[in-house]
Regions:
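Short hydrophobic/aromatic beta-strand or adjacent loop that forms the aromatic wall/cage
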Residues: 37, 148-152, 319-325
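Acyl-donor binding region in acyl/amide transferases
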Residues: 64-143, 256-315
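Conserved hydrophobic/aromatic beta-strand scaffold that supports enzyme active sites
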Residues: 73, 152, 232-234, 244, ...
Length: 331
């Protein structure tokens, strides 16, 4: 392929996608719904997209007290074009005062971020980001290094491999914690409580950014319409939500029989009296899944330093590894 003068990333808009051939299948409405600050594309002489990425320098995470910019919506059919787009994104973020670039990240960790770096043999699962092996290489070729690591783990035998509870069930019973499926007749009230738990539980997490209540509902309400309420359990105590676990079926198995749930999110209020509640929620979720005919559970996209990964490792094995990359823009 001839990489001549056309490899110059240009600013691009959602409307421009209607004028080109896009083999990456980008959903251009994401530029507005995910509030990208700028978008770049490399178009070849045949009017075909070779690479694209967006940048965010507003409402992004902090890292070591410094301002961070992020590079997301990345795709490339050609590494030379992809790396040109990444370098243009870095130049843009530097010009807007960012000390560090993170990627891939669509603005913040509420949206898609991370690359698969160790694929394993298992097929993709529901809500998992995916990428060709070449895309992380494009970032490292531009000077990025892994900043944080994440894993997904799989338990092929949820009937016999579950977290140990010891006396935790009795502890929660004595406290008066009640666990039940989300209230489908008043899911808005439960979602408000879940939002409060998420904000309290994750506020000290790595690269956390606040999310308003309405945007949180926008993420979860469409998912709730698809799943059986037994796969979203809510823990309540003294009239408020104190924890939850969300584990939709692996809908990417629809071409064959679905036998797997994806434990996507669980969170507990950071109060010592609720220590161990996460394990109880997971066990109750696995019991529900078994009753519904599921046999396998994926613990999805866990930071390797998080307690959720420690709970998962008791009964699940390695499946996939991911990384988020970073590069200083000040040196």
């Amino acid at each position: 392929m001839d990489h001549k003068d056309y490899i110059h990333p240009a600013e691009f808009s959602a409307d421009d996608y209607g004028e080109i051939d896009d083999p990456t299948g980008f959903e251009s409405e994401l530029l507005s719904s995910e509030v990208a600050d700028q978008h770049f594309a490399v178009i070849d002489p045949q009017n075909s997209l070779r690479a694209r990425c967006s940048v965010w320098w507003r409402d992004t995470p902090c890292l070591h007290g410094e301002r961070v910019g992020t590079i997301g919506h990345y795709a490339a059919t050609d590494s030379t074009a992809g790396r040109a787009a990444i370098r243009q994104a870095m130049h843009c973020l530097r010009a807007h005062g960012c000390a560090t670039a993170l990627g891939p990240m669509n603005g913040n960790t509420w949206r898609s971020y991370r690359f698969i770096v160790d694929r394993g043999t298992a097929p993709p699962f529901f809500l998992e980001p995916t990428n060709p092996d070449s895309w992380p290489v494009d970032f490292t070729a531009c000077g990025f290094d892994p900043l944080s690591w994440y894993v997904s783990e799989i338990n092929f035998d949820i009937a016999n491999r579950q977290p140990e509870l010891g006396s935790l069930r009795q502890k929660m019973d004595r406290l008066g914690v009640q666990i039940a499926p989300i209230n489908v007749d008043d899911s808005a009230d439960d979602l408000d409580g879940i939002y409060d738990v998420v904000c309290a539980s994750f506020r000290d997490s790595f690269l956390y950014t606040p999310l308003d209540r309405e945007s949180f509902r926008g993420i979860y309400e469409p998912l709730l319409q698809k799943i059986d309420p037994r796969l979203m359990l809510v823990a309540r105590h003294a009239g408020r939500v104190v924890g939850f676990v969300f584990a939709p079926p692996d809908y990417l198995q629809q071409a064959r029989s679905i036998d797997t749930i994806v434990i996507k999110t669980f969170a507990i209020l950071p109060d010592k009296c609720y220590t161990g509640l996460g394990r109880v929620l997971i066990v109750d979720m696995l019991h529900n899944a078994l009753d519904m005919g599921y046999t396998t559970a994926i613990s999805a996209l866990m930071h390797t330093e998080n307690r959720s990964q420690k709970i998962s490792s008791d009964c699940a094995g390695p499946m996939r590894r991911y990384a988020l990359f970073a590069k200083s823009l000040t040196s």
